[in-house]
């Protein structure tokens, strides 16, 4: 099933709703901490010292509840607290722990060597420093404890709600941060845990209840949906007896230039392996006889080009008059180059085509230079990697890498549908935001993005212009990389192999 995640402010509002229902905040904290302690005990059965790092807020209060329940089970527990002035439910949790004979050390009164010795002798550490309670850079005693933890401790680590050092909504690094083996999150997963870099620091995620039914206090619509291979069975492409090529839909690929002839054919291969009924590959006329035999299953359409071998705006007239009313999805940009002819063609298509359009590769660079025409009528999906996204947003690749949710939201607000490629690719249109938890570094090879653009085109042609179709395509592409890696192809793969493997994944959906 998909992972439905919520922004921290929505979960805080859910807590308030539970209180309005008559469940006191202290009871919610007790339920959450007790459930987390059960998960921790069942998973680790700690026989040595357990060190629980408690921050100043409610996450620290959760930590005190966990400490008490682990102590009740017989664990040797020491709490290292950054606060000497707790209030409210957090203070009550500390008082109950102390009343049971619990041991608390104020971090400000313990030297670095003493903290290091305490952590170095632990068999388990629980991070209850901040959870989702920080939006700024980690500092003070919290930063000090995290730095000492990273220097001196290498054993299992459990985070409560979110690993310290990462934003609960965006997953952005807040400076120094912990890497958990297990994150016990309360009521529902937090959105930030779905995005890198936080995703790579969460470890296994377990959701613990707080004593109220989630459906009564959380919004009906999640802020972020995480999808992966297990969800493919719910996204199957339509197929029935008597289905023909027309039912499967036509994908038209428009690309190629004097320098890059193979890219559009890789997109055509992706579309075919992604299940399209027909694929038309429109390329500069000089490339048609050279590359056409590489993908004989596609129909190659020679198109007008200039003296450099780049497509011109007249290419749209040819493809529109030949196939316009039959095209269900258009893929534009692979290998197109960035010359004046290509730029004119992109502007022409954006202004003329009123169906689904997947804009990729050089088409994105042209879009960054010229902007989206005011008269654009197409249903646009852009598929940038982080460098192309940076060009479209007028920022740096580093910013995009470090702020993937913010980048995807900015792109979607400007251009419509977006697939921000990379670790945990982000799919977004309107307010619907999905994160695809599938993929492998072996996918970072030339032509991989061209193949993905074709698979997206095929999924849209089969399922319609819906976010689910795009998510399915991105999952297929990601799982193809994972399957190749598991078969010994963790490096040195070819883009065409990704397409072929995606077809095998697609064909095996009945086994999901």
From Swiss-Prot:
Record's keyword annotation contains Zinc: no
UniProt-listed Gene3D superfamilies: 3.40.1190.20, YjeF N-terminal domain
Cofactor note: Binds 1 potassium ion per subunit.
Catalyzed chemical reaction(s): (6S)-NADHX + ADP = AMP + phosphate + NADH + H(+); (6S)-NADPHX + ADP = AMP + phosphate + NADPH + H(+); (6R)-NADHX = (6S)-NADHX; (6R)-NADPHX = (6S)-NADPHX
The family this protein is said to belong to: In the N-terminal section; belongs to the NnrE/AIBP family.
GO MF annotations in UniProt: ADP-dependent NAD(P)H-hydrate dehydratase activity; ATP binding; metal ion binding; NAD(P)HX epimerase activity
This enzyme's EC code(s): 4.2.1.136, 5.1.99.6
Species of the source: Thermanaerovibrio acidaminovorans (strain ATCC 49978 / DSM 6589 / Su883) (Selenomonas acidaminovorans)
NCBIfam families: yjeF_cterm, yjeF_nterm
Residues given in the record as ADP binding sites: 421-425, 440-449
UniProt binding sites for K(+): 59, 127, 164
PANTHER family membership: ATP-DEPENDENT (S)-NAD(P)H-HYDRATE DEHYDRATASE, ATP-DEPENDENT (S)-NAD(P)H-HYDRATE DEHYDRATASE FAMILY MEMBER
Chain segments carrying region NAD(P)H-hydrate epimerase: 1-220
Domain YjeF N-terminal: 11-218
Protein name from the UniProt record: Bifunctional NAD(P)H-hydrate repair enzyme Nnr
Binding annotation for (6S)-NADPHX 2: 335, 450
Keywords per UniProt: ATP-binding, Isomerase, Lyase, Metal-binding, Multifunctional enzyme, NAD, NADP, Nucleotide-binding, Potassium
Record region (NADPHX 1): 58-62, 131-137
Region: NADPHX 2, residue numbers: 385-391
Binding site for (6S)-NADPHX 1: 161
Annotated InterPro entries: CARKD, Nnr, Ribokinase-like, YjeF_N_dom, YjeF_N_dom_sf
Cofactor(s) needed by this chain: K(+)
A biological process from GO: metabolite repair
ADP-dependent (S)-NAD(P)H-hydrate dehydratase as annotated region, ranges: 228-512
HAMAP family: NADHX_dehydratase (MF_01965), NADHX_epimerase (MF_01966)
Keyword NAD: yes
């Amino acid at each position: 099933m998909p992972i439905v995640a919520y922004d921290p402010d929505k979960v805080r509002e859910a807590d308030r709703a539970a209180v309005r229902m008559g469940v006191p905040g202290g009871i919610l904290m007790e339920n959450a901490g007790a459930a987390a302690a059960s998960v921790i005990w069942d998973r680790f059965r700690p026989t040595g010292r357990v060190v629980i790092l408690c921050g100043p807020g409610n996450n620290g209060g959760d930590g005190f509840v966990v400490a008490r329940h682990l102590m009740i089970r017989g664990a040797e527990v020491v709490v290292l607290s950054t606060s000497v002035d707790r209030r409210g439910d957090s203070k009550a949790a500390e008082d109950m722990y102390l009343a049971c004979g619990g041991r608390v050390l104020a971090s400000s009164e313990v030297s670095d060597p003493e903290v290091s010795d305490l952590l170095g002798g632990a068999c388990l550490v629980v991070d209850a420093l901040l959870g989702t309670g920080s939006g700024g850079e980690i500092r003070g005693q919290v930063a000090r404890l995290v730095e000492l933890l990273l220097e001196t401790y290498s054993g299992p680590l459990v985070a409560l709600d979110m690993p310290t050092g990462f934003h609960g909504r965006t997953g952005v690094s807040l400076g120094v941060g912990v890497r958990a083996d297990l994150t016990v999150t309360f009521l529902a997963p937090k959105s930030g845990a779905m995005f890198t870099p936080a995703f790579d620091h969460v470890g296994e995620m377990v959701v613990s209840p707080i004593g109220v039914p989630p459906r009564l206090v959380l919004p009906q619509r999640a802020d972020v949906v995480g999808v992966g291979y297990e969800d493919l069975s719910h996204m199957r492409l339509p197929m029935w007896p008597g289905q023909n090529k027309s039912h499967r839909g036509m994908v038209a690929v428009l690309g190629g230039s004097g320098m890059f002839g193979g890219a559009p054919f890789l997109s055509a291969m992706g579309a075919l392996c992604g299940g399209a009924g027909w694929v038309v590959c429109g390329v500069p006329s000089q490339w048609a006889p050279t590359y056409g035999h590489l993908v004989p299953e596609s129909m190659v359409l020679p198109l007008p080009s200039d003296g450099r071998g780049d497509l011109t705006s007249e290419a749209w007239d040819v493809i529109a008059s030949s196939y316009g009313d039959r095209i269900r999805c258009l893929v534009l940009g692979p290998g197109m180059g960035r010359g004046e002819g290509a730029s004119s063609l992109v502007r022409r298509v954006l202004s003329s085509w009123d169906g689904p359009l997947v804009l990729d590769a050089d088409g994105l660079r042209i879009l960054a230079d010229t902007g989206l025409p005011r008269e654009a009528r197409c249903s646009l999906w852009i598929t940038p990697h982080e460098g192309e996204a940076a060009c479209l947003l007028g920022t740096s690749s580093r910013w995009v890498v470090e702020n993937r949710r913010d980048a995807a939201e900015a792109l979607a607000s400007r251009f419509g549908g977006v697939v921000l490629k990379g670790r945990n690719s982000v799919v977004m249109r309107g307010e619907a935001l999905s994160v695809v938890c599938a993929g492998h570094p072996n996918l970072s090879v030339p032509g991989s993005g061209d193949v993905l653009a074709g698979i997206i085109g095929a999924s849209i042609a089969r399922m319609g212009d819906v976010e689910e179709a795009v998510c399915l395509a991105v999952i297929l592409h990601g799982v193809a990389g994972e399957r190749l890696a598991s078969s010994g192809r963790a490096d040195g793969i070819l883009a065409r192999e990704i397409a072929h493997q995606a077809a095998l994944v697609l064909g095996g959906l009945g086994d999901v």
